[in-house]
């Protein structure tokens, strides 16, 4: 679901900016699971690699 993936991405960015990286990782991972071939998943994977 692209809409849910976008929401997850947006929420992940918010958590990341607040310094709550464990919540950001959880949401970015969910984005990849929900829509693995979307641009949202690509961006989420990039952020996951930057956090770790």
For the regions a language model picked out, list residue spans one by one:
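Short solvent-exposed coil/turn linkers within tandem alpha-helical repeat scaffolds
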Residues: 1-4, 31-43
């Amino acid at each position: 679901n692209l809409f849910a993936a976008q929401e997850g991405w947006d929420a992940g960015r918010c958590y990341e900016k607040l310094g709550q990286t464990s919540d950001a990782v959880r949401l970015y991972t969910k984005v990849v699971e929900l829509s693995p071939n979307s641009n949202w998943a690509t961006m989420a994977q990039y952020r996951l690699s930057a956090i770790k």
